[in-house]
From Swiss-Prot:
Organism: Rhizobium johnstonii (strain DSM 114642 / LMG 32736 / 3841)
CDD domains listed in its UniProt record: ASS
Gene Ontology CC annotation, any one: cytoplasm
Enzyme class: ligase
Protein name: Argininosuccinate synthase 2
Quaternary structure (record): Homotetramer.
Amino acid sequence: MASYKDVKKVVLAYSGGLDTSIILKWLQTELGAEVVTFTADLGQGEELEPARKKAEMLGIKEIYIEDVREEFVRDFVFPMFRANAVYEGVYLLGTSIARPLISKHLIDIAKKTGADAIAHGATGKGNDQVRFELSAYALNPDIKIIAPWRDWAFKSRTDLLAFAEQHQIPVAKDKMGEAPFSVDANLLHSSSEGKVLEDPSQEAPEYVHMRTISPEAAPDKATTIKVGFEKGDAVSINGVRMSPATLLAALNNYGRDNGIGRLDLVENRFVGMKSRGVYETPGGTILLTAHRAIESITLDRGAAHLKDDIMPRYAELIYYGFWFSPEREMLQALIDKSQEHVEGEVTLKLYKGNVMVIGRESDKSLYSDKLVTFEDDQGAYDQKDAAGFIKLNALRLRTLAKRNLVK
């Protein structure tokens, strides 16, 4: 707390919920600081006006509520999907990719309002504290960062509720007890963790899933869609061009209705522990499959394999919070270069939790009917050439075998 004694003005990442409302009041009462709130519309599906009204009720004069959905998808989600990024083989990084955007706006607002600190509501056990703070320091190395969950004296939900009552912070009746699990959501995904999900041997209750119907309840008839790409980014569905956020929202609807995008994962957190999360990424799951399909006919083999080699490192950088690091930007430049000719359309069949590629076409396709046909290729490929190719590639293996067979 001593390091905060000179803080006069703080920009708080504010959701309007109980926890960040308590943080807001704590900053006012314990630090005596003026608080500025920032609430981002990331497509989480919540009304944001209540956050404004609650901030006003708590005496806040400077309130920022910004619709960042297009920026989120255009500048963060789409660049990540150009890389086909997944953490530990399956996680589409829906929470991770939103944190640098929030930090960017916190820093921008701090500069605009003359604040000397920012604050967030991430706990001291999770990855988000790292992501928020690494991003903030990358953009302003001198900013002060306040993380109340690491500093305050509250030990339980009861302590928080008592503080709320003492300071007349409204508490909804359904918030009086501990929530059965915690939720984070944005336009790309929703994640649920904790409480009823902490035993990884037990199936998650169906009520945890808020973005998708169960695959068993999905329609018995498949849905077929076409996704169009330009320079590696999705630009259209069924021939209709859309903005990035509008397109992702539309894919979410297709995924939701067909039970697509559920993931039950035990992951390795950056801070060292394992955690179990239940994720729903309906549109992102469709997008990843479609992007890999269009790359399959437009990327050269060497470029495709190099991308696959660097992808785990790129995904790890995002998961750990290094979006604004030079190494992520270097990898991004390589990835973006690879996408110059990644354009065309992919036809997908969506059915009971599955995304199946049934067609792909591109004016920049490297797929040659003449080369792969089982019929007469009219001299496009001389099969006799394969003998020399194989013999040269076998040279080291034959040399090794001769040595090893000597007794």
